[in-house]
Amino acid sequence: MRSSAKQEELVKAFKALLKEEKFSSQGEIVAALQEQGFDNINQSKVSRMLTKFGAVRTRNAKMEMVYCLPAELGVPTTSSPLKNLVLDIDYNDAVVVIHTSPGAAQLIARLLDSLGKAEGILGTIAGDDTIFTTPANGFTVKELYEAILELFDQEL
């Protein structure tokens, strides 16, 4: 098999494994790829691939920390499991603060930014697990807080 074709197969297998959301260590990913016949794979190659494809560690449905590929989701929607990544939503006089699972804040902020001013969102600032959201003109912080709660099916 040509080198580029072999590389394409490796990338395809790598992405398929991460979509399973069951690998909590790079060593587990290496072992799974070796089982599929990729004998030249090692931890450093897996580490580079994780970085290249923007993989993050987050909690799966079983609440286990696993590697996943948020970039594969495209523009997320609130009907997807992303709402499970939101842990807490609170506000003060200036901003709404959203706490997420580690590594999920930028993905959730992207969703909020895509909704924009029509939903009362002027903009977001995201770290690793925290998002600051400020209301657009004509919206109060409390109104924005309630809109975000509704988006993620959270209780008041």
Swiss-Prot record:
Single biological process term from Gene Ontology: L-arginine biosynthetic process
Protein localization: Cytoplasm
Subunit composition and interactions: Homohexamer.
Top-level taxon: Bacteria
Pfam family, one: Arg_repressor
Function according to Swiss-Prot or TrEMBL: Regulates arginine biosynthesis genes.
Single annotated GO MF: arginine binding
Family affiliation: Belongs to the ArgR family.
UniProt protein name: Arginine repressor
SUPFAM superfamilies: C-terminal domain of arginine repressor (SSF55252), Winged helix' DNA-binding domain (SSF46785)
Keyword tags: Amino-acid biosynthesis, Arginine biosynthesis, Cytoplasm, DNA-binding, Repressor, Transcription, Transcription regulation
InterPro entries in the record: Arg_repress, Arg_repress_C, Arg_repress_C_sf, Arg_repress_DNA-bd, WH-like_DNA-bd_sf, WH_DNA-bd_sf
Gene3D superfamilies in the record: 3.30.1360.40, Winged helix-like DNA-binding domain superfamily/Winged helix DNA-binding domain
NCBIfam families named among the record's database cross-references: argR_whole (TIGR01529), PRK05066.1 (NF003457)
Native source species: Escherichia coli O6:H1 (strain CFT073 / ATCC 700928 / UPEC)
One GO CC term on file: cytoplasm
Pathway assigned in UniProt: Amino-acid biosynthesis; L-arginine biosynthesis [regulation]
